[in-house]
Amino acid sequence: MSVADIKKQDIVKDNGRSANDTGSPEVQVALLTARINELQPHFKAHMKDHHSRRGLLRMVSRRRRLLDYLKSKDADRYTALVAKLGLRK
């Protein structure tokens, strides 16, 4: 199950610098966050699905690396993105 194309386009429009900007760290983090959030109910229902959990952990670590990169390059964009996506408590 993946993020639908229309939802993906909305995420790109909301977080990208332009409508076709799919490579910026903000867009990549937002897309990964959407995929991670979609998988949460699956893991609540299937707690022993370790094979898929490994993929989830891979997505989480990739998002973490992208956030670390963004924080090192531009801290203002990092804080804005974290606040927008609600990643930190």
UniProtKB/Swiss-Prot annotation:
Source taxon at top rank: Bacteria
Question: Which terms does the UniProt entry file under GO BP?
Answer: translation
Is Transferase set as a keyword in this record? Answer: no
MF terms in GO? rRNA binding; structural constituent of ribosome
Which InterPro entries does UniProt cross-reference here? Ribosomal_uS15, Ribosomal_uS15_bac-type, uS15_NS1_RNA-bd_sf
Where are the stretches annotated Disordered?
Answer: 1-24
Alphabetical UniProt keywords: Ribonucleoprotein, Ribosomal protein, RNA-binding, rRNA-binding
PROSITE patterns hit by this protein: RIBOSOMAL_S15
Where does the record place Basic and acidic residues bias? 1-16
The record's Pfam families line, in alphabetical order, gives: Ribosomal_S15
Output the Gene Ontology cellular-component terms: cytosolic small ribosomal subunit
HAMAP family in the cross-refs: Ribosomal_uS15_B (MF_01343_B)
Describe the protein's quaternary organization and the partners it interacts with: Part of the 30S ribosomal subunit. Forms a bridge to the 50S subunit in the 70S ribosome, contacting the 23S rRNA.
Family in the record: Belongs to the universal ribosomal protein uS15 family.
Q: What role is this protein assigned?
A: One of the primary rRNA binding proteins, it binds directly to 16S rRNA where it helps nucleate assembly of the platform of the 30S subunit by binding and bridging several RNA helices of the 16S rRNA. Forms an intersubunit bridge (bridge B4) with the 23S rRNA of the 50S subunit in the ribosome.
* Protein name in UniProt: Small ribosomal subunit protein uS15
Q: Which organism is it from?
A: Ralstonia pickettii (strain 12J)
User: Which gene produces this protein?
Assistant: rpsO
